[in-house]
Amino acid sequence: MGYLGNKLQGKYHKDTFQTVNMAWPAIVESFFIAFAGLVDSLMVSSLGSYAVAAVGLTTQPKLLGLAFFFALNVSISALVARRRGEQRQGAANETLVTALVFIILAAAAFSVGFVAFASPIIHLCGSTAETHNGAVTYFRIIMGGMIFNCIQMGINSAQRGAGNTKITMRTNVTSNTINIILNYLLINGHFGFPALGIQGAALATVTGTVVGCVMSILSITKQDGFLNLGYILKNKIKPTIAAFISLVRVGYSVFFEQVFMRIGFMMTAIMAAKQGTDAMAAHQVGMNIMSLSFAFGDGLQSAAVALIGRSLGAKKPDLAKEYGRTCRLIGAGIAVCLVAIYLFGGRWLYSLFFEEQHIIEIGVSIIHVIIFVVIFQICQVIYMGCLRGAGDTLYTAVASMISVTFIRTIVSYLGGYTLGLGIVGIWFGVLADQMSRFIFATIRFKQGKWVKIKI
């Protein structure tokens, strides 16, 4: 059975089992979110390539708007996991309460700003006369309902940190199932529902998010939970400056990391948009396909954060390292399987979205690059997650800034414009970024300094 077989039979077989047991719900959750995004694009593609491109234009500004909350979520997961290992339930719930108050206030302010300035934001992202109005409509609806998404993400991050990955899986699977069903009913109009096109896709997404938000809130009402609303009320736990400072200390560098990453991603998206509507549509589907592989890494990353945080809180650094290595090994096996699927099924995947042969050919060329991207992507996502979960967020921020903001952008420009390779050249920038992050993360993980960080 090789290395993994020896692990299962040797000293760490119990740890490997715990990793898999905690990881599989997180993997299912992340995969289903990515799969729902792929289905969303598939249904939108029935409106034409312009619609796929329009929705694609909103992706990076939306994620840039959520960068602040992504950073906060990393802090929440890392701190709750560490407090779980330290067996400090009160401190963990204090972290959650403080974070939720902050999330509600910040999300309301962000939502108003993005809705008000939707048109110039989308124009900045490279919209054309064909895609602008649809993209603005979609963006306004999505960002108008972002508060529900932010609350859901905050609570789910805390639950993952506590090791409750099955709770977050149920929440997101339900939310995205509703999204898919409403997409079918509202995009083209079925069973008497109005055909709302792009607007229908946005409304479906927000409705699913509202349901997910309610389910997340209900998850902290269980009396036996480590994160427990009853416990919070009984002990009169309130937001504190100390908890806020802890969140900021862990999250500030993640925030800058997210901002610089989103700038890099947005630059790539703008370059892709300038290749034309058809190339942008093929690019967007390629990003959705790549998100499927990211989902596996993200699921294993969630498990690694919880297990590593708990191990470090319990003063077991060697166990923390072993959890990280085990997650990476499982991820490498998954990457090999995905490479085979993309290699032999890439053309078929693109034919689901487009009838135009020239767009399919563009997509097949993109798939050939994605095959190499996946190999580095899953492993770097896991190792980066391990480092963030331990609180080594400054290193991950610098590594991501160098890789995404600079290497990705420069190589994309050289490939797409200087060498004249078009959209495929831009994807070489994506590959260079993933390789760079993989190298940075692997070096840092193997140095082992991250296990000594206190949060």
Locations of the language-model features?
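Transmembrane helical elements of multi-pass membrane transporters/channels
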Residues: N21-D40, I141, S175, G208-G212, ...
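Helix-terminus/linker motif at the lipid-water interface of multi-pass membrane proteins
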Residues: F35-A53, I122-A129, L185-L196, F255, ...
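Short alpha-helical transmembrane segments in multi-pass integral membrane proteins
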Residues: M1-A26, V80-M146, A195-Y252, I308-V373, ...
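Helix-loop-helix hairpin linking two adjacent transmembrane segments in secondary transporters
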Residues: F148, N156-Q159, T168-S216
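Residue-level hotspots within the lipid-embedded alpha helices of multi-pass solute transporters
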Residues: S30-F31, A67, A107, S111, ...
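Transmembrane alpha-helix boundary and packing residues in multipass membrane permease domains
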Residues: A26, S30, S41-L42, A78, ...
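Small-residue-rich hydrophobic transmembrane alpha-helices
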Residues: V52-V112, N149-T168, M280-G346, Q377-M401, ...
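Hydrophobic transmembrane alpha-helices of multi-pass small-molecule transporters
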Residues: L64-A67, N179-N183, C213-I217, L292-A295, ...
